[in-house]
From Swiss-Prot:
Active site (record annotation): R170, S220 (proton donor), E290
UniProt protein name: UDP-N-acetylenolpyruvoylglucosamine reductase
SUPFAM superfamilies, alphabetized: FAD-binding/transporter-associated domain-like, Uridine diphospho-N-Acetylenolpyruvylglucosamine reductase, MurB, C-terminal domain
Physiological role: Cell wall formation.
Keywords in alphabetical order: Cell cycle, Cell division, Cell shape, Cell wall biogenesis/degradation, Cytoplasm, FAD, Flavoprotein, NADP, Oxidoreductase, Peptidoglycan synthesis
One Pfam family per UniProt: FAD_binding_4
Location, primary (coarse class): cytoplasm
Domain FAD-binding PCMH-type, first and last residues per copy: 27-191
GO MF terms held by the record: FAD binding; UDP-N-acetylmuramate dehydrogenase activity
Reactions this protein catalyses: UDP-N-acetyl-alpha-D-muramate + NADP(+) = UDP-N-acetyl-3-O-(1-carboxyvinyl)-alpha-D-glucosamine + NADPH + H(+)
Pathway membership, UniProt: Cell wall biogenesis; peptidoglycan biosynthesis
Species, as recorded: Listeria innocua serovar 6a (strain ATCC BAA-680 / CLIP 11262)
Amino acid sequence: MNNLQAQFPHIAIKLNEPLSKYTYTKTGGNADVFVMPKTIEETKEIVTYCHQNKLPLTILGNGSNLIIKDGGIRGVIVHLDLLQSIERKNTQIIAMSGAKLIDTAKFALDESLSGLEFACGIPGSIGGALHMNAGAYGGEISDVLEAATVLTQSGELKKLKRSELKAAYRFSTIAEKKYIVLDATFSLELEDKNIIQAKMDELTALREAKQPLEYPSCGSVFKRPPGHFAGKLIQDSGLQGHIIGGAQVSLKHAGFIVNIGGATATDYMNLIAHVQQTVREKFDVELETEVKIIGEDK
């Protein structure tokens, strides 16, 4: 794998890179090989090479709804953060995989285009948002997604239309097929900029009031169980404020687990398991994680 640097001298590649620098929890071990392509073509080159040489491949976006285990990740990590372009075409916006969802929503506001207001505070990348059909406050990415350009695991380029992008709550075809998102096209509607801004301000105020934005966290930890709210179940289980190591069930919103100082990924995972077990015993409800957990134990 170390041959990658010689094979691709034009692409930024780091060895044994600490992944805690790239996750919102500020936890995670090291990557064997950490690749930062600047273009779609460079991304395609790396993905194809990994496939041909049977190298394990992991795609990393903004690291916001993610826990990377303390043992890190073997093989090659491709970090798409440098694919940042956002542009307008009529009433559509085309955003590359590494563009931040927040920046894309702000771009839509600046262009007087409505439809992405719900995303104004979601801290993920476009690629990650498509992967999990991210949403908040009644809106989901799939509501406005028109098309996506993806790579297959073998490096084949595909253009997927809306009809091919079947999506459900925190699920998408992209995740199911392990596609690598390169860009996304959103169909929006013209609207008065002040109206869009007012909606964003309202949602931002709600987010700031309810979410522990002052601490590192992985966002909403659990999916919403049918007929319940995860945060309410956790609160009613007496777990709000519960601490394991440096990880704590947030005092502000029980659906979040925050890093109050020096937390490890293992702390997070132990606390998640404890919450799941307690809620299962008290309410006979299974809490399924929304946060993605990858990597190896230390």
